[in-house]
C-alpha cells in the first residue's frame, strides 16, 4: 500500500521563505526520512517550489489553456511530500504520527492519501487493457 504524506503550503512557503529555524527543520526531516529508509518504506520525498514557479493546465472541452502561477489559497496547495509503501494502513498511520512538524513556529498540517494500485481497477471493464500495459511499464521502470 502506498501513501503520500503531503505538507500543506503556507504564505511563507508560497513566498519561497525558509523559516528562521530551517536548520532544525531540515535536521528533523533528515532523521525521520533516514528512519523511513532503514525501515524500507520510503519511496520518494521532496519539497516543492512555490506555485509562482509552476503552472496549471485548464481543460475546457477539447481546449487546453496553460495558466502560470502563482495561485491563490496557499492552504490548498502542497509544499512538499513523502511517499511511503507500507503493508497496512495502520503502519502508514504510525509513520504519519511521527512526521516532524513542518513549520515549528506556527500552525500547519499534513494530509495523507492512499494511492490507487493497478489491482484497484481490476473490476473496471474499461481499464482492463490499460492495466496490462501499465504493468508492462512498471516492469520496464524497475529494470
Predicted segments — roles?
Residues 1-143:
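Conserved, structured core segments of small domains
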